[in-house]
Amino acid sequence: MQWYLVAALLTVLTSSQGILTTLSQSNGKYKYDYATIPFLAELFKLSFSSFFLWKECQSSSPPRMTKEWRSIRLYLVPSVIYLIHNNVQFATLTYVDPSTYQIMGNLKIVTTGILFRLVLKRKLSNLQWMAVVLLAVGTTTSQVKGCGDAPCDSLFSAPFQGYMLGILSACLSALAGVYTEYLMKKNNDSLYWQNVQLYTFGVIFNMGWLIYGDFKAGFERGPWWQRLFNGYSITTWMVVFNLGSTGLLVSWLMKYSDNIVKVYSTSMAMLLTMVLSVYLFNVRATLQLFLGIVICIISLQMYFMPVNMLVELPQALPVTSK
């Protein structure tokens, strides 16, 4: 399977996440416990990967699997990073408004490029660096409100701690992605075996988070397993399937492509979500959205198009004698 097909599918699925989540609400509220969604998504990814790993083991050429604990324990790290990241997200939102947080989140585009260079020793050309920065500028432009919609200085009115936590959140998100790519490419183990290790820890950590939530609430709603499917509808299950499928596609890209492709996919998905929201939820289209889309398309061409196509001048037409 070509990486650009996986990237395109990831863009479509990621763009539909927010839309499906909104459609799963009833009168603006969730009838289900939304903390169960990540747990079931991790369980779906683990079940899917386990099945195909079993199929590989039944074949005439068994897959390569590194089973030493010193290798397996490395797959614990992404779950720890994401757990810290989720808590930093909540802490950040106590200091800044959601729009400011979303704009600061675009820092992860640039920090991914930096960690891509420092951790994975992958060098980007000057043109590619410019493209990555343009992508961050484009996504930020699409999210900035006009002065008529909100105070123009609202972006810079949050406490200093909010900006520091926002930067930390972006760095943690980039670190989790780059570290996962490092795990996927450090050996030639089967992708499904690597997924099984990754998602086993994901299931354990999400289960632990549900148990922690029960203790924090004093078990007033009962244990989490008794309300696991309460309020679930077809749309809710579509959210679970969507979240699980995007995770599987991301792990494929981490194994056979790289983090920058994933960053472009998710950034384009965000813009696609905005465009679809204009038609589905009567959200007003803005000049900033249009400009952001144009900038991101230019960035996409700059990063992936062969250099000779970007700089090649058209051939002069031959002079014909009369």
Curated annotation (Swiss-Prot):
Q: In which tissues is it expressed?
A: Expressed in roots, leaves and stalks.
Where, in residue ranges, is this chain on the Lumenal side?
Answer: 24-33, 97-100, 145-157, 220-233, 284-286
One Pfam family matching this protein? Nuc_sug_transp
Question: Per UniProt, what is one GO molecular function of this protein?
Answer: sialic acid transmembrane transporter activity
Superkingdom assignment = Eukaryota
Q: Where are the transmembrane segments?
A: 3-23, 34-54, 76-96, 101-120, 127-144, 158-178, 199-219, 234-254, 263-283
What InterPro entries does the database record attribute to this sequence? Nuc_sug_transpt (IPR007271)
Transmembrane helix: is it a keyword of this entry?
A: yes
UniProt topological domain (Cytoplasmic) ranges: 1-2, 55-75, 121-126, 179-198, 255-262
Kindly list the places in or outside the cell where this protein is found, as annotated in its UniProt entry. Answer: Golgi apparatus membrane
> Would the keyword Transmembrane turn up in this protein's UniProt record?
yes
Gene Ontology CC annotation, any one: Golgi membrane
PANTHER family assigned? NUCLEOTIDE-SUGAR TRANSMEMBRANE TRANSPORTER
Q: What does this protein do?
A: Sugar transporter involved in the transport of CMP-sialic acid from the cytoplasm into the Golgi. May transport important nucleotide sugars such as CMP-Kdo (2-keto-3-deoxy-D-manno-octulosonic acid) in physiological conditions.
Family from the record: Belongs to the nucleotide-sugar transporter family. CMP-Sialate:CMP antiporter (TC 2.A.7.12) subfamily.
Protein's UniProt name: CMP-sialic acid transporter 1
What is the species listed in this Swiss-Prot or TrEMBL entry?
Oryza sativa subsp. japonica
Q: Which gene encodes it?
A: CSTLP1
